[in-house]
């Protein structure tokens, strides 16, 4: 991100250590603690490559245009399909939902007008860059009568939010890619302890994403 670069530069000039949690800066001296957003998208692509039938059609709900993590998640998804040799999968539409549930519902409502006929969807999956948009997609499809049975259309999100995990457990979402907030907090604390002790922390500490599906969701439910 360019937006936080000036603040990092100011801190660097005063000799103040900087930790970037979740978002990398494009310049400056800092320790990054977080997850690789590319990996989240790649996990979504891996799931779809394995579970979608030949010739499947997909709708993609991206995050916010111009944000690197949005681009990384999309790229990871696309690369996973390519690596799996799934050139038969068609991306019917790709639109920015800004990570907002209501915006995702609005977009999905419009997609349904275009890609559903006679009460039947002409698409097999909706891949979303976060859980809120995935939940919006679920509500939109339910409202249109296209998701009367769980799992009719594969819907995946990112975050591993409580609502996302519940939707996976109920079968309305096939996957959420968990962003391990607790793991990131623990890693950040460890960096702070090193700084307090006069040690030099690693420049980058990656906390892996985790793919959550019906097969392992029970391990994550509270």
Task: Describe every region a protein language model picked out.
Residues 1, 23, 32-43, 60-82, ...:
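Hinge/beta->alpha junction and helix N-cap segments in small-molecule ligand-binding domains
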Residues 2-39, 43, 50, 57, ...:
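Flexible loop/hinge segments that line or gate small-molecule binding clefts
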Residues 2-9, 100-117, 132-143, 161-169:
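Pocket-flanking alpha-helical
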Residues 11-16, 81-89, 117-120, 142-151:
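Short helix-capping segments at alpha-helix termini
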Residues 19-22, 128-131, 135-173, 212-213:
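Venus flytrap/periplasmic-binding-protein-like
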Residues 69, 80-84, 180-222:
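Hinge/cleft segment of the Venus flytrap/periplasmic-binding protein
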Residues 121-123, 173:
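Local beta-strand N-terminus motif with an aromatic residue
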């Amino acid at each position: 991100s360019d937006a936080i670069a000036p603040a990092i530069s100011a801190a660097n000039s005063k000799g103040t250590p900087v930790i970037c949690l979740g978002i990398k800066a494009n310049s400056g001296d800092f320790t990054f603690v977080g997850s690789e957003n590319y990996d989240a998208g790649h996990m979504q692509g891996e799931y779809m490559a394995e579970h979608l039938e030949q010739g499947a059609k997909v709708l993609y709900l991206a995050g916010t245009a111009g944000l690197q993590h949005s681009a990384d998640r999309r790229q990871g998804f696309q690369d996973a399909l390519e690596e799996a040799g799934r050139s038969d999968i068609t991306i019917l539409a790709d639109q920015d939902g800004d990570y907002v549930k209501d915006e995702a519902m609005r977009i999905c409502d419009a997609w349904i007008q275009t890609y559903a006929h006679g009460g039947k969807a002409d698409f097999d999956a909706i891949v979303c860059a976060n859980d809120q948009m995935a939940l919006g997609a679920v509500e939109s499809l339910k409202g249109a009568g296209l998701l009367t049975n769980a799992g009719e259309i594969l819907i995946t999100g990112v975050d591993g939010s409580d609502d996302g995990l519940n939707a996976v457990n109920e079968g309305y979402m096939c996957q959420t890619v968990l962003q391990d907030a607790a793991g990131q907090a623990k890693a950040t604390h460890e960096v702070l302890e090193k700084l307090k002790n006069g040690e030099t922390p690693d420049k980058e500490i990656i906390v892996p994403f985790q793919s959550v599906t019906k097969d392992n969701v029970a391990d994550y439910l509270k």
